[in-house]
Amino acid sequence: MRMSTTTEIIAHHWAFAVFLIGAVGLCGLMLLGAYFLGGRAQARAKNVPYESGIDSVGSARMRLSAKFYLVAMFFVIFDVEALYLYAWSISIRESGWIGFIEAVIFILVLLAGLFYLVRIGALDWTPTRSNRRVSKPSTVRYASSHPQDISQELSVAGSQQANESR
């Protein structure tokens, strides 16, 4: 006797359906428990950040550079790609040359993306150059710490000033 297709589908997927119902039910139970059992304090200090018993000073909003966000995104992207390469390396015997060629193309696309990121400066952490021109440094003579050299430099400087004043 052959089972109908709906019975086969139910028999095949019942465990996954029970898992989904259990996960959604557990999330709902935790949310309802927090709603009914949670405190309801409505004071002025409720919306003030708590800092280890110390009154906070200044703004709690700290500006982060977008570079940190970019690095996090690059990490996630390249980490997922490493996961794909790991899965490919496990099934390399079954995939054969076609799988190898696909992996090489995948790696080349990764390298092209990395090259593009380097080219646009997304991975460059040095500050950008300003367009200001730096003036040519003037010649400054530094006196040495030896007393004999200091007296010689003073006498040379004094004679130069005397010559300029004439």
Curated annotation (Swiss-Prot):
Its EC number is 7.1.1.-. It is found in: Cell inner membrane. GO terms for molecular function: NADH dehydrogenase (ubiquinone) activity; NADH:ubiquinone reductase (non-electrogenic) activity; quinone binding. The keyword Flavoprotein does not apply. Residues 141-166 are annotated as: Disordered. It is a multi-pass membrane protein. InterPro entries: NAD(P)H_OxRDtase_bac/plastid, NADH_UbQ/plastoQ_OxRdtase_su3, NDAH_ubi_oxred_su3_sf. PANTHER family: NADH-QUINONE OXIDOREDUCTASE SUBUNIT A, NADH-UBIQUINONE OXIDOREDUCTASE CHAIN 3. NDH-1 is composed of 13 different subunits. Subunits NuoA, H, J, K, L, M, N constitute the membrane sector of the complex. This is NADH-quinone oxidoreductase subunit A. It comes from Yersinia pseudotuberculosis serotype IB (strain PB1/+). The lineage of its organism: Bacteria, Pseudomonadati, Pseudomonadota, Gammaproteobacteria, Enterobacterales. The gene is nuoA.
